[in-house]
Amino acid sequence: MGRKDHTSLRWGYSTGACAAALAVACWQSLRTGTPPAVVPVLFGDGKERLLPMRPPAPGRMAEMVKDGGDDPDCTHGAVLFARLSACAPDDARPEDHRLDAGAAVLILRAVEGIGRCTRQGLDCPPGKWAVTGGPRRLLVENLARAGMTDGCWLLELGVENGAELARHTLNPRLGVEGGISILGSTGLVRPYSHAAYVETVRLCVRARQRSGGREMVFCTGGRTQAGARRQLPHWPESAFVCIGDFIADSLGIAARHRMQEVVVACMAGKLCKYAAGFANTHAHQVEQDMALLRRQVQACLPGETALHEALHHSASVREALLSIPEAGRQPVLHG
């Protein structure tokens, strides 16, 4: 999309914005008989942007490739497609969404690669296609702008290889089966977004709460998550969530959702940063507090003067821990 933030990373657009663009492209194609090359979409920030289409394959009225900008989401480059046709209100199936667009009625149906919600705690009811509230609003607003003012219409959306893409998302753990979700409150994708990461944690905790769970395991990465699962083999999959560097945000979310027990699985360097009270533990945000670690070692192992001196030459928490006899590490880490 061309927009860049202060880190010079390129913004993109969400699957929800793609759905709105495809719907408008289908509407224009019905009106003119020609698939448009670009489609104007009004985003949640109140700005209009032009999204490119590509020639649709047979059986499709509109088709496009999702551009996620410099965000690492697995849906970047995914092919989305749609069809639009007149229908009757009672053509809606139980899993379809029925949307009111002024005097018009839009029945929203997934035909390939979009999941179906099976649990509480998500932004669409159980049993419905996984198209959340933001995209549903974008759809009706943009179709109204394009001239859809009456009648009943069936919009069929699909994502090529969506079921495979979903394996690389949280959908299987959140109870979304069969494909990806159509997401995006504003339609914009901020690259490597702090807000997006924290929102993912919030969704996982909320889903856990609404399924009756009262405990979470916050893991800072893949290795710590694997280690935590070995230590807690009887805890359910839905209890384990990767939080990256956002310890303070994640603990706040757990408190607001009344979690009764939270286990934090992390490497020693991040543990030291937690002890120092840092809200964000990324290496670019804050350095390891070696002085704090030395004070902890002196308090837990007061007679080890040679060790105290050696720690002054340690460049990292990991290196320092290797200097501590194995029997003394547990008191230092848990003291």
Question: How does the language model describe each region?
Answer:
Residues 1-168, 172-174:
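Generic N-terminal targeting/processing segments that precede catalytic cores or assembly contacts
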Residues 2, 10-16, 174-180, 185-334:
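A structural signal for small-residue-enriched, beta-sheet-centric alpha/beta enzyme cores
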